[in-house]
């Protein structure tokens, strides 16, 4: 158990003032390396088993992996990633460490954290500026460059992987026979270039849907194109 706390500190996680309790709660921003830390725990220690409500690791014969939550069986030291996708009342008491990005989860699903990290390796400063303005966050990046652009869905063609946010955008993309993912289905995924379709301005998205907006805004590593009805007024 002490080794896990040392690993969290070594990877830049900040210990809060919250007294240790079960489970140990770790909140980390998208692209901060929390999955990397979990895999390091699995490789260093024989006991822990890790599960996720996001994207599981591919099967491996040689390395321990983060498994899908559907495969969960109680063990000696259980770890859960993306716990924020689960109502707190459904969280099994056997989990010793639980991780999530708090901005990607409904606020009712969150505990107070013992550790936090708001530095990302995924996207760059332009995305951080947009997120910090929209979510009153304090996210920083170790990536030096990225690109964000806005456009009209009627004038600009999508590029890269297409993500859709809100039912109105699902309908439009289906009518055009475009291949896309719903934002709610891409937790744990990333692509170099992403186009995000919005049905309204970022500032008009209701509070109960803002965690989904955050997911949509953080799937890219290089470039994000935001297409909405108010092409140049979609920023916060």
From Swiss-Prot:
Span of domain (+)RNA virus helicase ATP-binding: 1-117
SUPFAM superfamilies for this protein: P-loop containing nucleoside triphosphate hydrolases
Domain (+)RNA virus helicase C-terminal residues, every copy: 118-236
One example GO MF annotation: ATP binding
Primary localization: host cell
GO biological process, one term: transport of virus in host, cell to cell
Record carries keyword RNA-binding: yes
Pfam families tied to this protein: Viral_helicase1
Miscellaneous comment text of the record: TGBp1, TGBp2 and TGBp3 seem to act together for cell-to-cell propagation. TGBp1 is the main movement protein that physically cross the plasmodesma with the viral genome. TGBp2 and TGBp3 would facilitate TGBp1 function.
Family of the protein in this entry: Belongs to the Tymovirales TGBp1 protein family.
Job of this protein: Transports viral genome to neighboring plant cells directly through plasmosdesmata, without any budding. The movement protein allows efficient cell to cell propagation, by bypassing the host cell wall barrier. Increases plasmodesma size exclusion limit. Acts as a suppressor of RNA-mediated gene silencing, also known as post-transcriptional gene silencing (PTGS), a mechanism of plant viral defense that limits the accumulation of viral RNAs.
Protein name, per record: Movement and silencing protein TGBp1
Organism listed in the record: White clover mosaic virus (strain M) (WCMV)
């Amino acid at each position: 158990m002490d080794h896990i706390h040392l690993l969290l500190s070594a990877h830049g996680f900040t210990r809060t003032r919250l007294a240790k309790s079960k489970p140990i709660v770790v909140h980390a921003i998208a692209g901060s390396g929390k999955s990397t830390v979990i895999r390091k725990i699995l490789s260093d220690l024989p006991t822990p088993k890790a599960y996720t409500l996001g994207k599981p690791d591919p099967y491996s014969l040689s390395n321990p992996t983060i498994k899908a939550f559907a495969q969960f069986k109680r063990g000696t030291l259980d770890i859960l990633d993306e716990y924020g996708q689960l109502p707190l009342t459904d969280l099994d008491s056997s989990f010793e460490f639980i991780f999530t990005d708090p901005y990607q989860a409904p606020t009712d699903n969150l505990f107070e954290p013992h550790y936090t990290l708001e530095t990302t390796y995924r996207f760059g400063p332009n995305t951080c500026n947009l997120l910090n303005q929209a979510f009153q966050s304090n996210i920083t990046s170790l990536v030096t460059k990225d690109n964000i652009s806005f456009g009209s869905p009627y004038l600009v063609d999508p590029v890269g992987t297409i993500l859709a946010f809100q039912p109105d955008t699902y309908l439009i993309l289906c009518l055009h026979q475009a291949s896309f993912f719903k934002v709610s289905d891409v937790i744990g995924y990333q692509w170099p270039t992403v186009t995000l379709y919005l049905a309204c301005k970022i500032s008009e998205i209701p509070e109960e849907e803002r965690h989904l907006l955050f997911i949509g805004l953080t799937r890219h590593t290089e470039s994000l194109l935001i297409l909405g009805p108010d092409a140049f007024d979609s920023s916060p």
